[in-house]
Amino acid sequence: MSFVLLSKMAKLKFNHIRHTIISTQKSTTIMPGISQLLNNRLIGKEFSSAVPTMFKREDYKLTIHDIAFSKWRNLIRHNDWKDFNNRKERVRRYRHEDLPPQRCTGLYELGVGVIGQDQGQNFDPDNNVLGVYVGQCVDVKSRLQDYGRRGGHLPSGLYEDIFSEGYSVFYRWAPEAAATEGMLLSTFDYAWNTCSNGERRHLELQKLGDPEFMSKRKSQVLVPSIRDQVVTIKVEKSNYTFLTSTLKVMRPFG
């Protein structure tokens, strides 16, 4: 369905809602925010001016974009840097064998997770890795190598904290996905991102060691382009509340 047709349908929906509100105005109390929302839309103001709801990325195992990404792969084990600095035999600072096979432009997510000694091949990244950072670059392989060697541009304290807890660093990537980064950053608050989400929240990643939190992580797929808002109108004479409509509010990508 084209964007033009969707816009026309949305306008008809709002006109119908506004007509309903006007016809019951004498006996109705309307939420000021919703009334202004409707008026703004009808006179051409965009919803994007409103402050969007942000979801903590680590709370969600799945997103609408998962199909575009590779599987989660281990980049740095929690003891790799320590063992390398101690000159332990056959140890490297990062898992170079798990990097993308070619150099290309793309999008990547970093995650943290626990690989227990008893898990071995049964380790399930989807259930045990928390997404903490998203970025894009012209050469994903080189960027990941930089993270593996020296932590990249991220503060060293982030790595020290998670390694001390026994957590490892993971990544997944998708080629040619610059637009997707904007959608993810406009939807999710990543614990290690600051460009759109404010201060880093690395201390909150201690929840990775909380079995109750890990078992309750949300698995539903979030669609960044659509938000649901319920308009409630209270009719005072009848002393009851009814729902007039559920508005599908479209958020622009990026």
Curated annotation (Swiss-Prot):
A Gene Ontology biological process term: regulation of DNA-templated transcription
Origin superkingdom: Eukaryota
Subcellular location: Cytoplasm
Assigned keywords, A-Z: Cytoplasm
Molecular function GO labels: DNA binding
Domain GIY-YIG as annotated: residue spans: 103-152
Matches recorded under Pfam families: GIY_YIG_domain (PF19239)
One GO cellular component term noted in the UniProt record for this chain: cytoplasm
The keyword Metal-binding is annotated on this UniProt entry: no
Principal location: cytoplasm
Domain observations: Contains a bacterial GIY-YIG-like domain.
Name the record gives this protein: Protein EFFECTOR OF TRANSCRIPTION 3
Organism: Arabidopsis thaliana (Mouse-ear cress)
Lineage, highest ranks first: Eukaryota, Viridiplantae, Streptophyta, Embryophyta, Tracheophyta
